Design a protein with these regions (language model features):
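N-terminal "arm"/small-domain region of PLP-dependent enzymes with the aminotransferase-like
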Residues: 1-54
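PLP-dependent aminotransferase-like
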Residues: 6, 93-150
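PLP-dependent aminotransferase class I/II
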Residues: 37-38, 59, 205-282, 286-289
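Short, conserved charged micro-motifs
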Residues: 39, 303-310, 342-346
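Short loop-beta-helix segment that forms the pyridoxal 5′-phosphate
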Residues: 56, 68-90
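Active-site phosphate-binding strand-loop segment of PLP-dependent enzymes
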Residues: 129-188, 297
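Conserved PLP-binding catalytic core of the aspartate aminotransferase-like
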Residues: 284-316
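PLP-dependent enzyme catalytic core of the Aspartate aminotransferase-like
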Residues: 315-318, 325-358
């Protein structure tokens, strides 16, 4: 049996496998905040409804002002967009025909969008279990690259790297006249600071992507932003469609960025639940990635390909994210998000049952 094509809706998986869809499904493949959107969004939603009758601000002025204050960066260094996917697409267009280096395993959208824009793709595939970046190997590859994409924290492993290593990488890129794009879609789930956004003023070839859909659980609204040198922001903005960010997303985005208590509550919960799950799974004999965010990789070392475990869970109404299409993982791991405690308990129960069964 082949791996099913992963979709954003579990229905695609059950259809592909020709299995009846259980009445109750827990989708662990989606990495959004288990608490759902901040409560203030629901409270203000009706008041915001009038905004759908007007065109949104094409300059995103108020949202940019909030981001500027939060990041302590000039407004000219900020570009909001219709989610991380649109922003990756804008970057791929700017880098059209260039040589792009990807550190694998990583988010597949970089390769998809860059390939669509005629880029030449090369890969640095990290070794399993620790997924450390070999700086010497990376430096030699940078000599033949115009752009490096780094997903940090990494998706799908959840691994983070030290500020010292990140600065080594950005310095190596700068010396090779190579752009460094860091996708920080999950940076705000970690316990510690893991961003080098404050160094943007020192590195004119550093570009940072931020997604707001993950932490704030608003993937249906689509919102994110890029932090970069003003010259880069200007070029990207020229290629961006007018009214790229809708009016409701602009209003919600401002509220989300001010929801500090919500972020702190999420970080604490995710950290506690992740540590609990990882400990229990390791005790049961599973291998687990050293994630620091709201998802983690799991592997039954008694299996090569994890398809049997994936199928076992699917039949129980539990959907994992398989890794068959991640270079360097090739189906040997499954990814699970952190959800509410009772849902995590259901997953743990079934994973323990699998080990007893096998």
């Amino acid at each position: 049996m082949n791996w099913p094509i992963h979709g954003s809706n579990p229905q695609y998986i059950y259809n592909h496998l020709q299995l009846p869809m259980p009445k109750n499904i827990i989708d662990f493949s989606v990495n959004v905040n288990p608490f759902g959107p901040p409560a203030l969004l629901k409270e203000k939603w009706i008041r915001w409804f009038a905004a759908v009758s007007d065109y949104p601000d094409p300059n995103n002025s108020e949202l940019i002002e909030v981001i500027s204050e939060k990041e302590k960066l000039p407004r000219s260094s900020i570009l909001p967009g219709n989610g991380g996917a649109e922003l990756i697409g804008l970057l791929a267009k700017m880098f059209s025909g260039k040589r792009v280096l990807l550190i694998q395993p990583t988010f597949s959208e970089y390769e998809r969008m860059c390939t669509a824009n005629g880029c030449q793709i090369s890969n640095l595939i990290l070794k399993e279990n620790d997924w450390e970046i070999p700086v010497d190997d990376l430096s030699s590859k940078l000599a033949r690259a115009d752009v490096l994409f780094l997903c940090h924290p990494n998706n799908p492993t959840g691994i983070i790297y030290s500020e010292q290593l990140l600065l080594q990488i950005v310095n190596a890129c700068q010396q090779q006249d190579c752009f460094l794009v860091i996708d920080e879609a999950f940076y705000d789930f970690t316990d510690e600071s893991n961003t080098i956004a404050s160094y943007l003023k020192d590195y004119n070839m550093l570009i940072i992507i931020r997604s707001m859909t993950k932490m704030y659980a608003i993937p249906g609204l689509r919102l994110g932003y890029i932090l970069a040198a003003p010259s880069i922001i200007k070029e990207l903005h020229q290629n961006q469609a007018h009214w790229s960010v809708n009016a409701l997303a602009l209003l919600a985005g401002k509220e989300c960025l001010l929801a500090d208590n919500y972020i702190n509550k999420t970080k604490t919960f995710v950290s506690i639940e992740r540590k609990r799950m990882v400990h229990a799974l390791q005790q049961a004999g599973y291998l687990v990635s050293a994630s620091r965010v709201n998802f983690y990789l799991v592997r039954d070392p008694e299996l090569g390909d994890q398809l049997p475990l994936f199928m076992f869970l699917v039949k129980k109404g539990i959907v994992a994210r398989h890794t068959a299409n991640y270079q360097g993982l090739n189906g040997r791991w499954l990814r699970f998000s952190i959800k509410q405690t009772h849902e995590n308990d259901i997953l743990l129960k079934e994973l323990l049952a699998w080990k007893k069964k096998s």
